[in-house]
Amino acid sequence: MTWQRPDGRQPDQLRPIRFHREYTHFAAGSVLAECGQTKVLCTVSVQPGVPRFLEDTGQGWLTAEYRMLPGSTPERQRRELMKLSGRTQEIQRLIGRSLRAALDLQALGERTLVVDADVLQADAGTRTTSITGGFVALVDAVNQLVSKGEIPQSPIRHHVAAVSVGLLEGQPFLDLNYPEDVGAAVDLNVVATEQLELLEVQGTAEEGTLPRPQLNQMLDLAEIGIQQLIEAQRQALAS
């Protein structure tokens, strides 16, 4: 039996991706990232100073926070106030690690960039959309620092994007939506640069095991998606 995608896409086809830049007024960088029906507001704020372990090193820092808004899913999500769920902590650390890899932190100087990823609507892929859209907001934020003369040049080293790949009925599919995400035997999240150098691979075999040849197929499919996402980032930043 072959899995039929609910939205009619081909196995190697991304959902429509859009980046709406300068979506809010006050943040140094702000992007509404849309991946199909998943919508994430990504903002980047600049704060003076760095964590204590980086003080007097001349090096900057980037950290991330991730939340799902109450109306982002069919059933209302409770706000995480006093204590974050393990899932939320895992995702915001992933976003932070991924976007730090895009930066020359020494060139940033002793300041902190805070990436906020707020999920307005969730149809799977919220963490990958947060990373891919967060990068666009990050570029806008550091360009603002350059234009204000606060740093001499952009500390961006390379593009970073992320995508999911799932195994359904034994076949790999790119960029899962929610029905596919819950039905996948294997779910993989891949973060990479425009040179297709891997920054992170998160994978779980929900049912049974994952043979190495199938993992290679999934990574090959992820590379196709990463290239397309980075091209979409370039087009958005050039507009």
Curated annotation (Swiss-Prot):
The enzyme's E.C. designation: 2.7.7.56
Any one GO biological process: tRNA processing
User: Which InterPro entries does this UniProt record tie to the protein?
Assistant: ExoRNase_PH_dom1 (IPR001247), ExoRNase_PH_dom2 (IPR015847), ExoRNase_PH_dom2_sf (IPR036345), PNPase/RNase_PH_dom_sf (IPR027408), Ribosomal_Su5_D2-typ_SF (IPR020568), RNase_PH (IPR050080), RNase_PH_bac-type (IPR002381), RNase_PH_CS (IPR018336)
Residues that bind phosphate: R87, G125, T126, R127
Its domain of life?
Bacteria
Give one GO term, molecular function aspect: tRNA binding
| Family under the similarity heading | Belongs to the RNase PH family.
The job of this chain, per UniProt, is described as: Phosphorolytic 3'-5' exoribonuclease that plays an important role in tRNA 3'-end maturation. Removes nucleotide residues following the 3'-CCA terminus of tRNAs; can also add nucleotides to the ends of RNA molecules by using nucleoside diphosphates as substrates, but this may not be physiologically important. Probably plays a role in initiation of 16S rRNA degradation (leading to ribosome degradation) during starvation.
The UniProt subunit note reads as follows: Homohexameric ring arranged as a trimer of dimers.
Q: What is this protein called?
A: Ribonuclease PH
Question: What species does this protein belong to?
Answer: Acaryochloris marina (strain MBIC 11017)
Taxonomic classification, please?
Bacteria, Bacillati, Cyanobacteriota, Cyanophyceae, Acaryochloridales
